[in-house]
Design a protein with these regions (language model features):
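Phosphate-sensing "switch" segment of ASCE/P-loop ATPases
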Residues: 114-118, 128-179
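Inter-Walker segment of RecA-like/P-loop motor cores
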Residues: 39-61
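Walker B catalytic acidic pair
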Residues: 76, 82-84, 94
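AAA+/SF3 P-loop NTPase mechanochemical coupling elements
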Residues: 46-47, 67-76, 106-126, 137-138, ...
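Short gly/ser/thr-rich secondary-structure transition/capping motifs
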Residues: 59-65, 102-107, 145-149
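Conserved D-loop-proximal element of ABC-family nucleotide-binding domains
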Residues: 88-90
Length: 179
């Protein structure tokens, strides 16, 4: 239905980064070792971790130097969580406080580090495990209990932090072509 394609386009419609945002974003990526060049990062980050990401991968941590996780690598940009219910509940719960505070504090082995994470979180999911609940052309094969279990993978407090919920129905190719 184009949910992922839509999410990938969001950074292109956001305002240009300020110089301070460029510096801050570049610093985070430098610490993480993810800079692809020597100059400033001038475009808003778009991070899309796989649903198997660990809580440490999402929030940050590690041994030795406390490294930023995906929430901080997306700072001043977009963190896209595709197939939201497929992420572990433990990993998703890491997001609650950073979304609220705009920063994340990581404590590991007596060390404490705070990274900024002013992020737009965008998530996509199907209405049920098979993906066809409510589809006018295909029959959903999920039981009511299976759908409920699927939707309950996401906690209410996390859902409360999403300001906008949009249903994106499948559109036939012919309808797109004719518009």
């Amino acid at each position: 239905s184009g949910k992922s394609m839509l999410a990938k386009r969001i950074p292109s419609i956001l305002p240009d980064m300020s110089f301070d945002e460029m510096i801050e974003t570049t610093k985070i990526h430098s610490i993480a070792g993810t800079l692809k060049h020597d100059g400033l990062i001038t475009t808003r980050p778009f991070r899309s971790p796989h649903h198997t990401v660990t809580p440490v991968g999402l929030g940050g941590g590690g041994t030795g130097t406390i490294r930023p996780g995906e929430v901080s690598l997306a700072n001043n940009g977009v963190l896209f969580l595709d197939e939201l219910p497929e992420f572990s509940r433990t990993a998703l719960e890491v997001l609650r406080q950073p979304i609220e505070d705009g920063s994340i504090t990581i404590s590991r082995s007596g060390q404490k580090c705070t990274y900024p994470c002013s992020i737009m979180v965008v998530a996509a999911m199907n209405p049920c495990p098979c993906g066809y609940y409510g589809d006018p052309t295909r029959k959903c094969t999920c039981s009511e209990q299976k759908i409920k279990r699927y939707l309950n993978r996401i906690s209410g407090p996390l859902l409360d932090r999403f300001d906008i919920h949009v249903e994106v129905p499948a559109v036939k190719f012919e309808e797109l072509r004719d518009t």
